[in-house]
């Protein structure tokens, strides 16, 4: 009796069913002994049913408020309650079995208009038996059952033995709902944290992508900037090269023009020094034509550089003739004594003027058709040097070239020039023939390096043998004498029959001669 506790007093003697549809099937008129009781107790049963329904509805409203807040929470709560409250399948089987055996246990279930929870076990309901008239309606003591140990099979056994299944307590609903709320909150927090982590990962990836794109754009800008700089440098170098080429062409053209201007006045001065027949070297027509051409050179400089014309060729021939004439005049001044007469060097003015006029007319713009048909001047080779010259210039060149080929230049001796006017000059004049003989190179000698090498090896071997004999304590004179070296370069002295090197022999032979030819010393007479 210590483990028992009093059950709450109910004013009604009949237990209400959970579902009205199941109540007729659970008990029949045959097995229920209290079926013929009076109908005065029915209003009390309705009152009990309404009070219990209101209690259940208060619990369900509290849970509905939580379900409205989060939709997934409702599904989780329903699943948890289904696991916590066993189904009513075992109850139905047990009720039908009890009715078949005739035990008279009337199990009724509370019916609700919209049932939201699964049917409870037999232990969650209180069976009620109608009491007879005049008997106390106090309920017997209800046995204590642990919440975690009850199951469907235990509930069926307890229902058969005691017949007092307990009602569902409101604390169980509150405890289950609190655990479910905490579990749902933890799951929601975990999902929210996972979403935050995923969002942060996406954010970091996006920032990295943006940084890479920015770096790529900066690299492209840098590459474009460097390309622009290289193009500018290339343009500058091209412009510099073009400017240098243009300046070079202009410098060459200016040099040619200055040469023409220098040659003409010299020619006039040189013609003035000669006799009157040679004075008119150039005709007045040719002079006027040359001066007019020099004036128009500045205007036609660019056109001549881009489009070479036959006139340039004629100018080049004219410049070549003038250079040769200038060189010939310089050589004539050097060789005034041995040179031929002026009539042999210079042709008459009429012939030279006619040749120059023909060459200049071939280069005029009006005679473009005739310049193509003009014949090239004949060239002849020199018999001395083999070079080719114009037939007009070949005679003069041959005379000068023959003189240069036949003459031999004297080698300048700076030592004699420094010694001139001093006492050293007499010594050099006295020593002149000997030095001339010494200056003649000696004939080449045949190489005898192999014979020298073999003689050197023989000498080393003989020296090694002598060292070995001395180490043993013997006499080195017992060894055979070494053969003399056959060196053809050495010179034998005629007085002592020894061989010496050439330079050493030159010093030794006179001394040995005096020593050998010296008379013997006088004998000493002993007293």
Swiss-Prot record:
Compositionally biased tracts (Polar residues): 50-61, 301-312
Gene3D superfamilies membership: Classic Zinc Finger
Source species: Mus musculus (Mouse)
GO molecular function: zinc ion binding
Cofactor annotation: Zn(2+)
Gene that this polypeptide is encoded by: Zc2hc1c
Coiled-coil residues: 207-254
Protein name: Zinc finger C2HC domain-containing protein 1C
Zinc finger (C2HC/C3H-type): 378-407, 489-518
């Amino acid at each position: 009796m210590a483990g028992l506790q009093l059950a709450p007093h109910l004013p009604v003697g009949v237990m209400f069913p959970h579902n009205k549809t199941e109540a007729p099937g659970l008990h029949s008129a045959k097995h229920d002994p209290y079926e013929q009781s009076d109908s005065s107790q029915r209003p009390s049963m309705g009152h009990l049913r309404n009070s219990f329904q209101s209690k259940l509805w208060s619990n369900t409203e509290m849970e509905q408020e939580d379900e409205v807040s989060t939709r997934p929470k409702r599904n989780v709560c329903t699943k948890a309650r289904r696991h916590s409250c066993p189904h009513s399948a075992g109850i139905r089987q047990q009720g039908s079995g009890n009715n078949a055996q005739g035990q008279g246990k009337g199990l009724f279930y509370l019916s609700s208009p919209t049932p939201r929870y699964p049917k409870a076990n037999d232990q969650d309901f209180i069976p009620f038996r109608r009491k007879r008239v005049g008997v106390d309606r106090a309920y017997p003591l209800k046995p204590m059952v642990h919440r975690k140990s009850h199951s469907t099979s235990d509930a069926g056994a307890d229902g058969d033995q005691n017949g007092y299944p307990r009602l569902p307590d409101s604390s169980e609903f509150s405890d289950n709902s609190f655990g479910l709320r905490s579990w749902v909150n933890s799951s929601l927090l975990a999902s929210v944290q996972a979403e935050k982590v995923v969002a942060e990962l996406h954010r970091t990836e996006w920032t990295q992508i943006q940084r890479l794109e920015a770096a790529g754009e900066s690299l492209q800008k840098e590459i474009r900037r460097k390309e622009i700089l290289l193009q500018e440098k290339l343009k500058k170098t091209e412009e510099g090269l073009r400017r240098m080429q243009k300046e070079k062409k202009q410098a060459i053209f200016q040099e040619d023009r200055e040469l023409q201007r220098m040659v003409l006045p010299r020619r006039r001065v040189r013609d003035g020094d000669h006799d009157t027949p040679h004075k008119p070297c150039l005709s007045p027509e040719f002079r006027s034509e040359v001066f007019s051409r020099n004036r128009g050179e500045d205007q036609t400089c660019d056109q001549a550089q881009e489009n070479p014309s036959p006139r340039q060729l004629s100018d080049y021939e004219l410049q070549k003739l003038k250079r040769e004439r200038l060189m010939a005049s310089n050589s004539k001044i050097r060789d005034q004594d041995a040179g031929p007469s002026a009539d042999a060097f210079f042709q008459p003015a009429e012939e030279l003027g006619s040749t120059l006029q023909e060459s200049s007319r071939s280069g005029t713009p009006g005679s473009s058709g005739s310049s193509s048909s003009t014949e090239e001047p004949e060239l002849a080779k020199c018999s001395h040097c083999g070079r080719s010259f114009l037939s007009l210039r070949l005679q003069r060149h041959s005379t000068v070239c023959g003189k240069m080929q036949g003459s031999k230049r004297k080698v300048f001796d700076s030592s004699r020039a420094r010694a001139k006017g001093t006492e050293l000059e007499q010594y050099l004049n006295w020593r002149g023939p000997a030095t001339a003989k010494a200056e003649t190179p000696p004939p080449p000698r045949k190489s005898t390096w192999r014979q020298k090498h073999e003689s050197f090896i023989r000498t080393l071997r003989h020296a090694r043998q002598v060292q070995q004999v001395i180490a043993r304590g013997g006499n080195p004179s017992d060894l055979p004498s070494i053969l003399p070296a056959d060196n053809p370069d050495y010179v034998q002295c005629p007085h002592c029959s020894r061989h010496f090197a050439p330079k050493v022999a030159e010093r030794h032979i006179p001394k040995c001669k005096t020593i050998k030819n010296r008379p013997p010393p006088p004998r000493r007479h002993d007293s």
